[in-house]
Regions:
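N-terminal positively charged helical leader segments and presequences
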Residues: 1-84, 243-246
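Structured adenosyl-cofactor binding patch, chiefly the S-adenosyl-L-methionine
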Residues: 17, 22, 113, 132-140, ...
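RNA substrate-binding interface of SAM-dependent RNA methyltransferases
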Residues: 24, 51, 87-174
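Short, acidic/turn-prone active-site loops that include or flank metal/cofactor-
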Residues: 33-35, 56-58, 124-126, 194-196, ...
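Short amphipathic alpha-helix with an adjacent loop that forms part of the alpha/beta core around
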Residues: 82-87, 158-160, 178-183
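Short glycine/serine/threonine-rich phosphate/pyrophosphate-binding segments
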Residues: 102-106, 198, 223
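Active-site/ligand-binding-proximal alpha/beta "capping" segment
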Residues: 167-222
Length: 246
């Protein structure tokens, strides 16, 4: 990720349309055979007056496998300071070295849909905020605040000092994720790397380690699925409290 920001290159119809709606698109590469399609014309209209290049095939310049005929060069998005994610209603997803950018994008999409207030990612040894992540996020990374930090354990300490409870997802924990009362408080859910789980240092910073209950004999869930379940459980718990009379 560039020091000045992320999201410089975006690919795919939904991701580029979201970047255009956010006013970030500076240049578009569009396949000639698709230029008159309604979805492409809509993107061009949303982008205002971008520099437009018509090409035979965008795949040779694309990072993603299926760019859907459109690639955009964009003004970068600036990360938010970590401290801006704390507060009374904080609901954060911290990614402990997630490596697959498609998982990163999928988690961002679920987090936004569940009303989470921000995401924390590592600048090192982790999936970049790349075109692949943006395509998987389908516009979510245009909206949800992202803090980019050098150390996840250090970030968790800072969040704790800011009054945020830290809940780590750990398949081996005997504590059930569903119904955790601290989800009504400022909280950050920590999702570990694919196939590895939480790092030792990240796990030590957690106030609670919790697992997703599963049927006997089933394998652990994908990181993005686990994150989605945690995000929507936070939403469910908070709504159940707000809907309680008195």
């Amino acid at each position: 990720m560039a020091p000045a920001g992320y999201g410089n290159r975006v690919e795919g119809l939904h991701a580029v349309a979201a970047a255009a709606a956010a006013g970030r698109v500076r240049k578009l590469w569009v396949e000639k055979r698709r230029v008159d399609r309604p979805e492409i014309r809509s993107i061009v209209g949303l982008a205002g007056e971008p520099e437009l290049s018509l090409v035979a095939d965008v795949r040779s310049m694309a990072e993603t496998e299926a760019p859907q005929g459109v690639v955009a060069e964009c003004t970068p998005i600036l990360p938010v300071p970590l401290d801006e994610l704390t507060g009374a209603g904080a609901a954060i997803v911290a990614l402990d070295h997630i490596e697959d950018p498609q998982n990163l994008g999928a988690i961002a999409r679920s987090a936004l849909a569940a009303g989470m207030t921000g995401i924390v990612v590592s600048a090192k040894r982790a999936a970049p905020l790349s075109a692949t992540a943006f395509k998987a996020a389908a516009g979510a990374l245009e909206q949800i605040p992202v803090a980019v930090i050098s150390s996840i354990p250090e970030a968790l300490n800072r969040l704790k000092n800011g009054g945020v409870w830290i809940v780590g997802l750990d398949a081996g924990s005997g504590t059930d994720l569903f119904g955790l009362k601290i989800f009504t408080e400022p909280v950050a859910v920590v999702v570990g790397a694919e196939g590895i789980g939480l790092s030792v240092l990240a796990a030590k910073r957690c106030d609670v380690l919790a697992s997703i209950p599963m049927a006997p004999g089933t394998e652990s869930l994908n990181a993005s699925v686990s994150a989605a379940l945690a995000c929507f459980e936070i939403m469910r718990v908070r709504r159940s409290v707000s809907d309680t009379p008195g």
